[in-house]
C-alpha cells in the first residue's frame, strides 16, 4: 500500500510538471504575471493607488498610471543606483536587487492604466500654465515643455508623461529638481529650466497638468 501511494504521488507530480511545461510551450501562460512581480505591483499600489492614480496626503505619492515604460524603468534604476535622491519613506529593499525583467513588468503594468486625474490645481491658473507648457518662457530662455513631453503631455521614450500628475507633486519636483535629482540622466536639461521658472509659473504649470488626461 505504501508503494502504491508513493507511486501515485510521483505520477501526480510528473503529470503536473508536464502540463505546466505544455502550457508554457503553447504560450498560454506567457503573459501571466509571475508571483514576485505581482507582489511588487501590489506593493506599489499600496502607496500610489489601486489604479496608479497617486495619493494626496501628508506624503504625496506621484501618479504612475500611463507613465512611459522607458521613463518608469529609468527611475527605478536611478533609485537603485542612488542617482536619484531617495525620500525617507521609500523602502529601498524593495528596489535594490530588482531585476531588469521585474522593472519591465512594473512599467508595463502601470503604463496601461489611465484613471481620471485628480485635478486640484487652481483653475484660474490653467490657461497660464497651458501657455507656458505650449510656448515656454522665451524671455527666461525656457523652452516649451511640449517640445519634449508632447503636446498633450503624454511623454515619449525617456521623457516623462506629465498629464494628470498630482498638483503638489509637480510643484515639489520643479522646485527641488537640483537638490533631489541632480544626478538624474535628464538633469542637464531640466535643472536649468526648473531654476529659470518663477514660483508662480511653476504653480501655473502644475495646475494645468493636474487636469490633463
Give names to the regions the model predicted.
Residues 117-165:
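Surface-exposed interaction/gating patches
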Residues 32-82, 86:
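The feature marks the first
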Residues 23-41, 53-60, 111-138:
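Electrostatic cytochrome c docking/interface patches
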Residues 42-50, 106, 142-152, 205:
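The canonical Cys-X-X-Cys-His
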Residues 1-11:
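Bacterial N-terminal signal peptides that target proteins for export
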Residues 66-69, 75, 160, 165-166, ...:
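Extracellular/lumenal glycan-associated surfaces
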Residues 56-63, 78-121, 156-161, 180-213:
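Axial heme c-ligation environment in periplasmic c-type cytochrome domains
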Residues 9-20:
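Bacterial N-terminal signal peptides
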